[in-house]
Amino acid sequence: MDQEVMDFFDFSKELNRVPGAPQGYISSDPWLMATESKSSEVPNRETIGTDYVTKIVAKEKCRLNRTLLEYQPQGKRNRTLDDLDTDDEAEETEIRRDDEYYKKFRFNLNRDKNLSIYAKREEILAAINAHPVIIIKGETGCGKTTQVPQYILDEAYKSGKYCNIVVTQPRRIAAISIANRVCQEREWQQNTVCSFQVGLHRPNSLEDTRLLYCTTGVLLNNLINNKTLTHYTHIVLDEVHERDQNMDFLLIVVRRLLATNSRHVKIILMSATIDAKELSDYFATTNSIPPVITTNHGRKHSIEKFYRDQLGSIIWNEEDVGDQHVPEINKHGYRAAVKIIVIIDNMERKAAIQSRLSYDETLRYGAVLIFLPGIYEIDTMAENITCMLENDRNIKVLIVRCFSLMTPENQRDVFNPPPPGFRKIILATNIAESSITVPDVSYVIDFCLTKVKVTDTASSFSSLRLTWASKANCRQRAGRVGRLRSGRVYRMVNKHFYQREMAEFGIPEMLRLPLQNSVLKAKVLNMGSPMEILALALSPPNLSDIQNTILLLKEVGALYLTVDGVYDALDGDLTYWGTIMARLPLDTRQSRLIILGYIFNMLEEAIIIAAGLSTNGLFAHDGGRTQLGDSFWMHYIFADGSGSDLVAIWRVYLTYLSLVEIGHDQESAIRWAKRFHVSLRSLKEIHLLVQELRVRCMHLGLIPFSVNPSQMMDDREKAIMLKVIIAGAFYPNYFTRSKDTCADTDRNIYQTISGHDPCRTVYFTNFKPAYMGELYTRRIKELFQEVRIPPENMDVTFQEGSQKVFVTFKQDDWIADSSKFVPVSGRVQSEVYKAVMMRQNRLERPIHIMNPSAFMSYVQQRGIGDVIEGRWIPPTKPLNVELLALPSVFDKTISGLITCIVSCGKFFFQPQSFAECIGNMSEIFNAPQQLRNYVNNAGDITKGMMVLAKRDSYFQRATVIRPENQSNRQPMFYVRFIDYGDCALLSMQQMRLMPRELTEQYGDLPPRVFECRLAMVQPSSMVSGNNRWSTAANDMLRSVAKSGLIDIEVYSLFNNVAAVLIYMRDGIINDKLVELMLCRRSDEDYMSRKDHDFRLRRQESARYLSSAQRQQINEEYMRSCQLPEDHDLRPPPPEKCKTVVILKGPYSPLECTMQCITRVGSSKRVNIDHLSVNALLLDADPQDHHDHLIVAHEIAENRNGHTLTARGTTLMPNVQGFGALMVMLFSPTMQLKCNREGTSYVSVLGGLGCDPETNEPYFPEHDVLINLDVNILEDDVILINQIRYYIDSVFFNFKDENNPAVSANERVSIYTQLRSIINRLLCKDRRYIERNMSNADFEWETHPDLPPPNEPFGKRAIFPMHSLTELQEEDTGRLVQLRENCSMLHKWRNVEGTLPHMTCKLCNQLLDSVPQLRLHLLTILHRDREKQIDYCNQ
């Protein structure tokens, strides 16, 4: 055979391409050609700033001046900013008395005079009476939140005037606890005079309430709905400094309504760290400037502050300074912090000598709190402290981490005292600024840094940016010390930089986070366009951000593209979807999930997932960079093989809910949460939000309906539908799991692991052949103990001359411990995921070996193997390939029986040629003299032992797998019948010890069956999950097996498993299963196709060979099929192993990457969040060359903008064309693009569409592109249009109508139709097509001759109908060329020589060698393409 061909199949040799590829090609991978396209570059859009604000604000100021100067009610209600002066409801100006009310309740007028706010009581009340707006600036603890509202209420009581006060709080817990505290102080019954409202949690009646504490969002929604402030006499906005979007929008609404119809309502703004001047200017008029009242309370203990330049050379060297203006912590900064800890310790030791307190006592109250910007910096700081203090044994520290995702146990460690003699060092993010207070902190080391979430409104990508904290933040941090004694604060910046260059306050949310909810509130407020409303913000956003937000809302269906039928880039009419989104306390895409959940009758699942996505920290983090506990794998357990973080959230919550419903106590719940590494606190928050969302949905008319049991979805259909609505909710956050379509890709995978099964194999590197690896297999197996993979579940092998160590995990359901099973999707075993996670956690792993120079003497002395000519040969078991039951290389069809069926992917076949042998053995085994060795003692049975075991009525050869785990009854054992393949659980009475003579005669006889699987098919994701075969498919195979003798065609033999086709009376079962949609067609993997090609050519040449030649060729073939064995030798004793070798790995050849399909992300590198179930992204179906779609809940961008991180990911079903179908289904509009000849559709472009006159895209950043690899036909577009019509019809309402027009019965009918059509769409067996690329992929095309589609809902459609260009007939000349190309390829298939560079024109595939060509001809893509051009190989 030609040497080039032999080299191609020799995995020990690198594959070198012969130079001389045709000019103009980058590679044979069309994806790589696509990267050169300039059309993927996002066109630069001009950034428009805040110039638009000036004119709008000036008009608003005039209105405010006019209203507060002299109120003149108008009779007409206008809706434009230019004319709006009043509301329909005239403001009450009469003084309303409430004497009867005050008689009902006890009013104690004695207030706490010890609070510092009390000294300002009269000043505050006088200011409220004199001004419409006042500002109170009071430190935390001064009493302003509880006392100021009471002062107002007391004054109203004295005068008998009606009073209704509302006080906002940014957090639910604060509103509840403060209201309860006031009730307790005043001795009022809860929910009478004083009450609270958070979300929808409120008293049944607020009739008696005169002091209401509520969240900011509650008041904001009330004011938007009522469009007046007059329901209250006083509005107190507390913690106004936080500047979240709700607060900023509330300020807009308050000022707007104050300027229109509510001038007599008093506004009180309060905060500890407030920019008083900014707020004063915001509410100032020509006649009134809001007064600022400041109150402070003195501290009991002093605080000293030190800055970086004041510490000087004590902790910093001159050369360590660096650029102090760059927000970062370099290695010198970490070291400086450690030096400060040492200085603190030395200082306290000296002070202890001079004081009465001992050093150990000072340690109890001398905790050090170090503020760091994130978890990465926390881990780095911990490593530096541990490393640098190892040399100073006198200082003992307890390092405690403090961040939002930590476990409750770790949270408690923050407050617990340290062990005697230890100093507690708390490494915290900004959560420790205000959320927690640790009394024993006496020292703060503040790097003055924080991480701020910023979202690019054009791309929707968010990023955590490391930036300088504001002075307000730093003051909050400094306030953490001095609780029990004097404290010190060390700021790691220069004093001048702190005072002159650091900002006083942080960046408001409205300038850095998405504006969707604010714009929706502006639309519901209906007092002007979003631009006109947001221009009135305290910090107005850029006009570009408003425009981008409008585009995003149009994309999610919250706004129509037009205003009164005319396109407007800065506005759009509100849809009913938008109304729902505005009323749900969620991100718009989470609200869209609920809307789609309602449409598909999966509302409960959608609500739970949306609530989980809105709550941080569900899966608890243990802390520490190097910990690889069970916490990560709990994601996989709860995801249950779905490949979805969102499904994991749903299943965690259902489990928690079942615990609540059966009445588990708190301790049991804590133990459960600890075991599964979930946060009970987060689950309780999710539970509250789920309950709130249910009520809100009910108020909106979103109520699930019941269906007949026969119409209910089974678990599999529900899983598919859930993923469909996830894809719809989070469009266009789409990624494809990239598949390199280069012809050598499959070969390279197997070459990397020397022909092992990539779905079960990982490998280490850096282990030289001279180390004699076979002697250390047990040591290598021990490395996997950290991920709890038992040694008996793996084989360790080596490749001659290679530095790789291969670890192959065994595929045996009977051996695996189900308690350690981690469900994953696809063919890859869970152990591979665990192994790769080991490497990601720590790359290098040491192993101790003997000095290679002493190795030979060691094995010779102990007689381990043989040493031949200075080369060690490990001991091996003899193998007589003639006795193997495996099909010969010359066998195409074989008759026999299927003896055992596990599934269509694993069954055992007993050739008819062995019938006589089996009969003779059975007769011998069941002779009475052979069955006398009863098993009387369970200890006599050992794992792997050969015994005689009862199968049906006869005893047969069997191997003991393992004993049953249960110990509460008589011993039982799992056994495998060697000559039949099936397993059974048997008692000792059903087993016999095999006599010695039988063991000698039959102990080494290989099984008389061989394992099989169906060839060229794989389980369908539409009928079964986790790569499992459906019950219906397995039953069909069992039915065929029961018919007796059958014929199979052997496609290939790999890893001693035969891929076969099974003949039935009316065809082949493989094809029948595809026809019945119980499975789908699939390519065979590389090794299978390689073996098939080899077998075909050997069978074609068989007639030219003698019997002896055929026997010799078959023996060589059988030996080549056997992989290296695991020798499992006892390693040398530890005292002889002094040399350390650093293994690197484990690696998997299936590790792959993702590609973002949106235009703005297509050129960026993509990672998956390290806490996701898809963080370890492997090609779970390596034989499948389709791109798999992954949908992300959120996309983050790194600091330099080059890398994206997908969060909350879901791996979509492995359905042909699924990604393209989802784009067509859920994009606002799309175009199916044709190839150059116009004969087939080759790509899908989705997005908001383009300007019909200029062809410029409305939202180019979010245009998505998928190149098709399967046929999409006109029928598919018709089905998709039907689905879009039904989705639209659920919420369609006529203009000026508030509620949808669809009835309850119609909704059930719509749901039934949706299910049916989606199943039809996804179950289609689609033909493969070649990849086509174009430099105009992202360009929207115009087809003036194409008639517009029929629009049932006109311009009020959220999902308008897609139009379709008509395909052309294939040109006859082109068909001739393609057929001639095919004919030439088939002729070259039989050539033994060098192939000139050739291209398969059908598949757009470059071919470099004859072996490559042969295997390409066996792919489904090529075979489908041949059918499409009616080519028949003669």
Swiss-Prot record:
GO molecular-function terms, A-Z: ATP binding; ATP hydrolysis activity; RNA binding; RNA helicase activity
Organism: Drosophila sechellia
Transport keyword on record: no
Keywords associated with the record: ATP-binding, Cytoplasm, Developmental protein, Differentiation, Helicase, Hydrolase, Meiosis, Nucleotide-binding, Oogenesis, RNA-mediated gene silencing, Spermatogenesis
Disulfide bridge positions per record: none
Gene3D superfamilies reported for this sequence: 1.20.120.1080, 2.30.30.140, 2.40.50.90, P-loop containing nucleotide triphosphate hydrolases (3.40.50.300)
Transmembrane segments: none
Pfam families per UniProt: DEAD, Helicase_C, TUDOR
Lineage: Eukaryota, Metazoa, Ecdysozoa, Arthropoda, Hexapoda
GO biological process, one term: global gene silencing by mRNA cleavage
Localization, UniProt: Cytoplasm
Every Helicase C-terminal domain range: 339-526
A GO cellular-component term linked to this record: P granule
Catalytic activity of the protein: ATP + H2O = ADP + phosphate + H(+)
Annotated motif DEAH box, positions: 238-241
Superkingdom: Eukaryota
Residue sites binding ATP per the record: G138, E139, T140, G141, C142, G143, K144, T145
Record protein name field: Probable ATP-dependent RNA helicase spindle-E
Record domain Tudor: where: 938-1001
